Regions:
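N-terminal helix-turn-helix
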Residues: 2-73
Length: 73
């Protein structure tokens, strides 16, 4: 992939991650993976990968009891 292509992909990934964060911020409480995926226009597997990255960065968290996601603290 060319350098320009890599930059475009990186920017797209950041935009998608921000969209997932916006969905989390708009929820009243924790949300299920399917709801986050649908609101973000992603497949469940794509949303799960973005959520895993956001959790690793401390920007989101998953409730161990319910499996639902919300903004990190």
């Amino acid at each position: 992939m060319s350098e320009a292509g890599e930059r475009r992909q990186g920017i797209q990934s950041v935009g998608i991650g921000l969209r997932v964060l916006e969905v989390l911020a708009s929820q009243n409480g924790a949300a299920a993976l399917g709801a986050i995926a649908q609101a973000s226009d992603l497949s469940a597997s794509q949303a799960h990968r973005y959520l895993a990255s956001l959790i690793a960065a401390g920007m989101a968290r998953q409730d161990a009891a319910t499996g639902r996601y919300e903004l990190g603290s």
